[in-house]
Amino acid sequence: IVVTFAIEEEVIDVPLKDAFIVPIVTGIGKANAAFSLTRAVLLEKPDMVLNIGTAGTQKHSVGDVFVCDHFIDRDLSLLNLPGITSELHTEHLLFNPYGVVNTGDDFVTDSEVLHGDVIDMEAFAEALVCKRMNIPFVSVKYITDIVGKNSLKAWEDKLSDARKGYEE
């Protein structure tokens, strides 16, 4: 199992019995995530990919955890061009999925209304890599901040809480 984290501060132990875990730090953003995950998939040939990370929200609470099956690329969704994939689902690959991730290459700090339960910068890219390579993908997000409420500072302050929350 390849387990992805955007930054070193998000890395936690993932104790899955009888599983060989390969943790990778992808870097922030869709391009870094897609590159790092593709390289890891080609080298490791995993049975599945688990993305663990932090995210913001507009409608839930700090400390909530979401298992996500629906992914939106907020940057590509603005283009509305034929052949562009800006939304995908991975529910056929998961058990008991719920949650929508809205992914883009910006740290959202204003209260612009965005579709989704959680807002991040990597999950769509990783879901797309896995879907195209036919690898089961699970994304688990810990809410660290409420968009529009000093989001960047809140995210920085809550990183350690996210690690503790996942480990519980």
Locate the predicted segments by residue:
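Gly/serine-rich nucleotide phosphate-binding loop at the start of the catalytic core
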Residues: I7
